[in-house]
């Protein structure tokens, strides 16, 4: 299974991996933060070692997104959520990470029940980390079947192998999925401009500190202006979509890297679990 194009990757074939810092060092006077950083590095080293896994993979590859560590231990993938809080996402405690691992499992099984295998706890005792039930639960991972590289829709498109037939297969899969989702008044209210603006306004607020660094003031104000203009000019369209029950619990992050298309099967995976309103 691949992660998003933002991922960074490294691999190890045996023994203890050479670590690259994955968290900022804690400032002086913050021993608790430093302890968390040290624990994360030990956990990453454990999960990068092929000897750690019951099925003894030949190698382990680590891919990172901004919110997860993804360990590819063929034929399985183990995904661990980073302990962080970003406003729209909160993985800050072990219990919250357990909850969202379970949500990831449940939500993605709607579209690919054979890929998402279970939530696997990782234990820690005096002897270190283990998948065996020894000591206390230190972390949770989502265990998945690995998807064969070369068949992600982004890769097929780059090779010129996506035509009308392939697009129709994706459409048919999504149509069945949307038809299976029942309208829910509590979800449909999120189709109003007022509710949708919660997410876009939140995004603008979170981007403001980076104006002049990663986005120019003109670009920021232009995007915000046209976003708000679109809401104001299309209110009837938004309300019509609600009346026609078109607001459903969907995927939330549907792009080419999250569609896997072989001659035998189509797999749409990695929907958003950390914020329900992003899927509506």
Which functions belong to the PLM regions below?
Residues 7-8, 224:
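Prokaryotic Sec-type signal peptides and long signal-anchor helices
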Residues 2-3, 9-143, 148, 265, ...:
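Conserved NTP-binding catalytic cores of kinases and kinase-like/nucleotidyltransferase enzymes
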Residues 88-95, 129-135, 142-252, 260-280:
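ATP-dependent phospho-/nucleotidyl transfer catalytic cores
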Residues 256:
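Catalytic-loop Lys-Pro-X-Asn motif of eukaryotic-like protein kinases
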């Amino acid at each position: 299974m691949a992660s998003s194009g933002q991922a960074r990757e490294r691999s190890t074939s045996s023994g203890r991996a050479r670590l690259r810092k994955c968290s900022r060092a804690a400032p002086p006077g913050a021993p608790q933060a430093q302890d968390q950083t040290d624990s994360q590095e030990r956990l990453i080293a454990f999960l990068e070692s092929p000897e750690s896994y019951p099925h003894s993979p030949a190698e382990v590859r680590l891919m990172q997104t901004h919110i997860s560590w993804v360990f590819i231990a063929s034929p399985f993938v183990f995904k661990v959520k980073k302990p962080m809080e970003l406003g729209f996402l909160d993985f800050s405690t072990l219990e919250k990470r357990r909850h969202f691992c379970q949500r990831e499992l449940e939500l993605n099984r709607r579209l690919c029940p054979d890929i998402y295998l279970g939530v696997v706890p990782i234990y820690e005792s005096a002897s270190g980390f283990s998948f065996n039930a020894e000591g206390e639960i230190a972390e949770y991972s989502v265990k998945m079947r690995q998807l064969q590289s070369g068949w992600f829709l982004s890769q097929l498109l780059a090779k010129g192998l996506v035509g009308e037939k392939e697009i129709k297969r994706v459409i048919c899969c999504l149509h069945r999925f949307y038809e299976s989702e029942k309208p829910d008044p509590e979800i449909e209210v999120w189709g109003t401009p007022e509710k949708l603006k919660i997410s876009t306004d939140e995004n603008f607020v979170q981007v403001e500190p980076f104006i002049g660094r990663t986005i120019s003031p003109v670009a920021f104000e232009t995007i915000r202006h046209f976003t708000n203009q679109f809401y104001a000019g299309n209110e009837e369209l938004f309300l019509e979509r609600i009346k026609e029950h078109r607001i459903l619990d969907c995927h939330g992050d549907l792009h080419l890297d999250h569609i896997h298309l072989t001659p035998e099967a189509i797999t749409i995976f990695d929907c958003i679990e950390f914020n329900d309103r992003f899927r509506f």
